[in-house]
């Protein structure tokens, strides 16, 4: 089987993001990968799949199940399937999110994006 190329795309939207390997609404058995930027913002969601975040730049606070960890460039964290994750950048964070399999295509429960004071 030949390699599959996913062309580069600009970061767009709120929060700024781009789909590298897009999650499919009908589900996926491999991984989905996205790049995210937060600028003095937080994003909260509950997802049916494992989510691994790798921080490229800045500082990212991740809270799940009552525990909060602080990540810097080069750090990564796993938020397990079924968990609610709060991803908070006090100033700026750019990260790569890898989503584990979601064969049933169950959607995430998105609480949304909000600015930090």
Describe each model-derived feature in a short phrase:
Residues 81-106:
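Ligand-binding loop in jelly-roll beta-barrel domains
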Residues 49-60, 65:
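Glycine- and acidic-residue-biased ligand/ion/polar-headgroup-sensing regions
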Residues 1-35, 112-117:
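A short, N-terminal "cap"/entry segment at the start of jelly-roll beta-barrel domains
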Residues 66-82:
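Short acidic-glycine-tyrosine-enriched beta hairpin
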Residues 45, 62, 95-97:
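Short hydrophobic/aromatic-rich beta-strand segments that constitute the beta-sheet cores
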Residues 30-47:
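Conserved short histidine dyad/triad with adjacent acidic residue
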Residues 107-111:
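Short, charged, solvent-exposed linker or helix-capping segments at domain edges/interfaces
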Residues 46, 54, 73, 81, ...:
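Conserved strand-loop elements at the edges of beta-sheets that form or border functional pockets
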